[in-house]
């Protein structure tokens, strides 16, 4: 939490209060995204052209029976599938009853398996038994089938817990794909292999993959010119929408003077919008996206108040005030920065209420309760630091499961999603379903491993890594290895909750999956790309919010 012992503010109410010395770097973007000017006429023209091409694709391509697997894969990879959801669903239902024995080609069998599993069809991994030899190993002849290896590698990331054949497939393909990159740098698929070895499709943010794949698809001699044109136009159109949204949210941030009022907090508005863009990018979720971005911005400030600035007495008063959620509690907060924060928090949720229909308010109330929960978790961690308490691994998880913020963000992501979210959805969420639990634990472990170096530079509560080391008497390396094994297991558990019939609508499950993908991007490099904005995050933001695709 701080580089010095937290002091009781009641003893220092009329004196200078000793504050933590944690310093976060300022925004690297300045006012770059504050203004975005595009005429409505230009937007309408772009939309009309995209819509025109969509209708042509439906008529000329989707009605064809030619290579439906490849078509669905390309629509998804090019970022176009959201335009053709019903058509893709119909095709997948037809493909699901296609006998897999017809797929003797490794690439096609793997693609069939992956596409169906992605959409919740519980197809059996026994389809890959035919590619093994008499000794139970994958056939050596497959090593030269590079497209097949690549397709099997991607399919292996849709595995469930205990599916040994897919674990074997992952090990087999990883070994040989790495060898291709190392020994055949001129191989036409070498660059693509390097990318997916680092982050497979299952763990990749959809829009980032679309940006990458459009350039790959364009170089493919067999590409469909109509699909390529639509993909480019659609990507650039969505980028216009997103830049317009980011401009609105950046103005909200500026008008509230958050950076000035809370100079100790991370100023990461652009990074936060990118984060939420990874959760849902589709135009129909604009309202949900803007609301969630504002909530995550408020949560980031809250985290820094509890983790890098507030004294234990201040935090105790603030926690009580938040639990009551009553503007009259503001008078009990002694410090001006806390009064300002408290009013902004309550005012923001009042504004959110105005944006929702009366029959939608129960969703916001649920999300508000999650905000109270996370703040309770923040205070528990502050108390640990103040008392020098070292929790057990299990005790740490009980609190840090909440303070990770994952459940809060998932709940809040549902608020603006219109009719797809119902009372039943929130009832499902309240029972801590496997996909949410797996995503949250995965996020907790990756966060703690990724932010470890930075946190060690200041006085901070023990992480799950520290607690695991102490509880089980192992080294840091061994603890990290074990937590990474758990991360792999949690990915498999996420896959399992997509199996049809799902308890909640598919878009709900996708939100949870997408939150997990963002965490993978932010923390996989072994650092915290959000706190200390690094190369990966900067390049990702530029790819989606700065650089358009040449037509």
Swiss-Prot record:
InterPro entries: Isoprenoid_synthase_dom_sf, Terpene_cyclase-like_1_C, Terpene_cyclase_plant_C1, Terpene_synth_N, Terpene_synth_N_sf, Terpene_synthase-like, Terpene_synthase_metal-bd, Terpenoid_cyclase/PrenylTrfase. Its EC number is 4.2.3.174. Keywords: Lyase, Magnesium, Metal-binding. It holds the Pfam family Terpene_synth. Binds 3 Mg(2+) or Mn(2+) ions per subunit. The keyword Lyase applies. It catalyses: (2E,6E)-farnesyl diphosphate + H2O = (2E,6E)-hedycaryol + diphosphate. SUPFAM superfamilies: Terpenoid cyclases/Protein prenyltransferases, Terpenoid synthases. (2E,6E)-farnesyl diphosphate binds at residues 266, 303, 307, 444, 447. One of its GO terms (biological process) is diterpenoid biosynthetic process. Its cofactor is Mg(2+); Mn(2+). The Asp-Asp-Xaa-Xaa-Asp/Glu (DDXXD/E) motif is important for the catalytic activity, presumably through binding to Mg(2+). Belongs to the terpene synthase family. Tpsb subfamily. Involved in sesquiterpene olefins biosynthesis, constituants of cannabinoids and terpenoids-rich resins. Catalyzes primarily the conversion of (2E)-farnesyl diphosphate to hedycaryol, which is spontaneously converted to elemol as a thermal degradation product. This is Hedycaryol synthase TPS20CT.
């Amino acid at each position: 939490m701080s580089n010095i012992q937290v002091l009781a503010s009641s003893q220092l109410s009329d004196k200078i209060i000793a504050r933590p010395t944690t310093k976060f770097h300022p925004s690297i973007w300045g006012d770059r995204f504050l203004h975005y000017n595009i005429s409505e006429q230009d937007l309408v023209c772009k939309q009309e052209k995209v819509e025109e091409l969509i209708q042509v694709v439906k008529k000329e391509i989707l009605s064809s029976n030619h290579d439906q697997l490849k078509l669905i894969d390309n629509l998804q990879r090019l970022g176009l599938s959201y335009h053709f959801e019903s058509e893709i669903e119909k095709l997948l239902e037809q493909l699901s009853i296609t006998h897999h024995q017809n797929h003797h080609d490794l690439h096609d069998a793997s693609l069939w398996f992956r596409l169906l599993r992605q959409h919740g069809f519980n197809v059996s991994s026994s389809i890959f038994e035919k590619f093994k030899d008499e000794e139970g190993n994958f056939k050596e002849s497959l090593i030269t089938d590079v497209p097949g290896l690549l397709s099997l590698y991607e399919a292996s990331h849709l595995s469930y817990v205990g599916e040994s054949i897919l674990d074997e497939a992952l090990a087999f393909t990883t070994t040989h794909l790495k060898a291709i990159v190392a020994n055949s740098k001129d191989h036409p698929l070498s660059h693509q292999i390097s990318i997916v070895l680092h982050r497979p499709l299952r763990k990749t943010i959809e829009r980032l993959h679309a940006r990458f794949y459009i350039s790959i698809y364009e170089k493919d001699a067999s590409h469909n010119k109509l699909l390529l044109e639509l993909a480019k136009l659609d990507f650039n159109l969505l980028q216009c929408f997103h830049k317009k949204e980011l401009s609105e949210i950046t103005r909200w941030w500026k008008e509230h003077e958050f950076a000035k009022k809370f100079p100790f907090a991370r100023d990461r508005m652009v990074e936060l919008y990118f984060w939420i863009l990874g959760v849902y990018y589709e135009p129909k979720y604009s309202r949900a996206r803007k609301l969630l971005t504002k909530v995550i911005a408020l949560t980031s400030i809250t985290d820094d108040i509890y983790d890098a600035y507030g004294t234990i007495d201040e935090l105790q008063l603030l926690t009580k005030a938040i639990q009551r959620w009553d503007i009259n509690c503001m008078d009990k907060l002694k410090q001006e920065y806390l009064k300002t924060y408290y009013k902004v928090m309550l005012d923001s949720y009042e504004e959110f209420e105005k944006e929702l229909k009366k029959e939608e308010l129960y969703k916001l109330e649920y999300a508000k309760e999650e905000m109270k929960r996370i703040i309770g978790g923040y205070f528990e961690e502050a108390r640990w630091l103040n008392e020098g308490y070292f929790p057990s691994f299990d005790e740490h998880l009980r609190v840090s499961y909440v303070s990770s913020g994952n459940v809060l963000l998932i709940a809040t992501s549902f608020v603006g999603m219109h009719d797809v979210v119902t009372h039943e959805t929130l009832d499902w969420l309240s029972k801590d379903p496997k996909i949410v639990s797996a995503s949250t634990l995965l996020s907790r472990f990756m966060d703690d491993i990724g932010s470890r170096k930075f946190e060690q530079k200041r006085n901070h509560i023990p992480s799950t890594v520290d607690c695991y080391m102490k509880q089980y008497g192992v080294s840091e390396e061994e603890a990290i290895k074990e937590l990474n094994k758990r991360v792999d297991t949690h990915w498999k558990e996420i896959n399992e909750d997509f199996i049809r019939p799902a308890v909640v609508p598919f878009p709900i499950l996708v939100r949870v999956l997408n939150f997990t993908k963002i965490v993978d991007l932010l923390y996989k490099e072994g650092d915290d790309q959000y706190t200390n904005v690094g190369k990966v995050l900067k390049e990702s933001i530029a790819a989606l919010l700065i650089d358009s695709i040449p037509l």
